A protein has these predicted regions:
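N-terminal positively charged helical leader segments and presequences
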Residues: 1-90
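Hydrophobic alpha-helical segments and helix pairs
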Residues: 84-110
């Protein structure tokens, strides 16, 4: 797991841009926050990057299992500081897990 501590890191900036529709459309990705939502995304195999708040990766058995499952799928894992998580997250009080998820498009049958 790589450690990110700078809010000016290009990876952090790219993730933070996903708060805006323009960048979500451009990158075909969006942010998911919180243990349950991230867990569902990992189980679906659509997570590109997983950001874990520093000092919380073993906070619970469930969280450790989510991180292990993401690692097994080859997801890019980052341990981030609180200022970095605040920059990435869209909520006022960020969760311990935030993920960049690939946007799936479904074709409608005519």
């Amino acid at each position: 797991m790589k450690e990110l501590s700078s809010v000016s890191n290009p990876i952090v900036k790219a993730a933070a841009e996903l708060k805006q529709k323009k960048y979500r459309t451009e990158q075909q990705a969006f942010l998911v926050e919180g243990m349950r939502s991230v867990e569902e995304a990992v189980n679906c195999g659509i997570v590109k990057q997983l950001f874990v708040l520093k000092g919380t990766k073993t906070a619970s058995v469930r969280q450790a299992a989510i991180i292990a499952a993401a690692a097994a799928e080859g997801v890019e894992l980052y341990e981030v500081t609180e200022p970095v998580m605040k920059k990435i997250a869209d909520t006022e009080t960020p969760q311990a897990l935030t993920a960049v998820v690939a946007r799936q498009s479904a074709a409608l049958e005519e």
